[in-house]
């Protein structure tokens, strides 16, 4: 856009005021943190394709692809889309230190895996919309899934049968989306209190789930 930016080792940035902007064509990338729950839906419940997603993106949350592959899901990508297909899922290890917004989606993935998955980086979750590590453990327990956060900076999720229940989103959009994806394979409906909080980052989340014929 014609604006000059100075920096110190890309840690500090300095932008002089009163610069003149110039028009240009710019393509805005899809949001990988928003796409993550839908990609997990494909891994646990059927085939899902998300458009306008580039594997060459610099967004840290592209790491969801690595987690899906490690768990055994089939992943196919093009220059503009990612498709995930359900396969038999196995426990996985993953370091989410640099992509903490993936924790809720990873929880719904791990809940559907055979064995105990280990995810590192829980210290990054203390000051999110809720204390996400504690909230995930509390709400998934209601669905019969054990999440152990006793070890510093580590979350262990024992996959198993997901039961219908009523959960509280705690006003956290990613918790609501995580439990909605978990509900896809539950043995009875999961009721999510405060589900409207998804509007913070993904207002059409439930509409998009309905397009996948989810009820």
Where are these regions (language model features)?
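Short, structured segments at the rim of ligand-binding sites
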Residues: 1-215
């Amino acid at each position: 856009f014609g604006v000059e930016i100075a920096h110190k080792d890309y840690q500090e940035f300095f932008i002089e005021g009163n610069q003149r902007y110039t028009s240009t064509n710019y393509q805005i990338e899809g949001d990988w943190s928003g796409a993550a729950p839908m990609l997990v839906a494909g891994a646990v419940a059927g085939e899902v394709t998300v458009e306008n997603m580039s594997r060459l993106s610099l967004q840290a949350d592209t790491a969801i692809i690595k987690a899906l592959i490690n768990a055994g899901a089939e992943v196919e990508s093009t220059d503009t889309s990612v498709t995930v297909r359900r396969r038999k899922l196995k426990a996985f290890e993953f370091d989410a230190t640099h992509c903490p917004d993936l924790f809720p989606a990873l929880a719904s993935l791990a809940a559907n895996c055979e064995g105990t998955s280990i995810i590192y980086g829980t210290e990054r979750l203390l000051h999110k919309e809720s204390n996400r590590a504690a909230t995930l453990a509390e709400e998934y327990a209601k669905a019969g899934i054990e999440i152990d956060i006793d070890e510093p900076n580590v979350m262990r999720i024992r996959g198993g049968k997901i039961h219908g229940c009523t959960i509280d989103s705690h006003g956290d959009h990613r918790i609501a989306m995580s439990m909605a994806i978990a509900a896809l394979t539950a043995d009875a409906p999961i009721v999510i209190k405060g589900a409207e909080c998804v509007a913070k980052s993904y207002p059409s989340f439930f509409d998009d789930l309905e397009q996948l014929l989810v009820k």
